[in-house]
């Protein structure tokens, strides 16, 4: 099904975000990354995607927007959001068997402008 058709049916922010996360996960897999976890939750919040790229574990925040009226999707990852993601990453790592040689924090920006194909941008190690 074409993304434009799916976008036409996406009526609320939650569905738009879920579709953006699916596109982001597919994009990362196509780039050779392994998706380790999706929507990992604890009482303090949620991590969108956790992926592995060789010896690096990437904690990936996915931001999806319909347009640029409020800035790029990546600009929505505020200082407060970055701090929360760092804390959640430590909690996730504490639950795993490790060892974790390297970690990084990525942002995948998904811009879904009506009538156009989604534009996906993977920003590595941005915070």
Swiss-Prot record:
It comes from the Bacteria. CDD domains: PoNe_Nuclease. PANTHER family: UPF0102 PROTEIN YRAN. Belongs to the UPF0102 family. InterPro entries: Restrct_endonuc-II-like, tRNA_endonuc-like_dom_sf, UPF0102_YraN-like. Transmembrane segments: none annotated. One of its GO terms (molecular function) is nucleic acid binding. NCBIfam families: PRK12497.1-3, PRK12497.3-3, YraN family protein. This is UPF0102 protein NFA_41430.
